[in-house]
Amino acid sequence: MSHNQDLILVVEDNKASSELMAYLLRSAGNAVLTCSDGADAIEIAGREHPRVIVMDLQLERMSGLEAATILAADPGLKAIPRVAVTAYAMVGDRDRVLKAGFHGYIAKPIEPSTFAAQIKSFFVPAPHLSKAGD
């Protein structure tokens, strides 16, 4: 499954939330991998190079904020868009999330009718898919 251009990594330790996000993304035609902590997310991202990483902030072994900071500092992984999906929707949380290395922020509860489109909006063109001469 490496280098699948529609692969999305969902990092969420709440099983029901993880299953819902994966279902919505798969229903929209995406391949999805899931894991439940930031350390696994870093390992999977390095191996699979997903198109987008969707990550909760509060995770067991390593928080989403810590994982995003590590991903943002890694030259081979920093270009992968990272989207925080979290129940933290207080004033200032969005700025804190973006400063930690996330590219976007979606507050929980997610809106099922628009979730997949919100995530796809973070897709960036894959350089190796462009035509010669572009």
Model-derived regions, located:
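Conserved acidic carboxylate
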Residues: E12
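Acidic catalytic/metal-coordinating carboxylates
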Residues: A16, D37-D40, S63-T69
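Charged docking surfaces used in two-component/phosphorelay signaling
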Residues: E19-S27
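Short hydrophobic/Thr-rich beta-strand motif most characteristic of the beta2 strand and flanking loop
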Residues: G29-S36, I44, I106
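Short amphipathic alpha-helix used as the core "switch/output" element in two-component signaling
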Residues: E43, L65-K78
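Active-site beta3 strand of CheY-like receiver
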Residues: E48-V54, L59
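The feature encodes the CheY-like receiver
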Residues: E60-S63, K78, M90, K108-P109
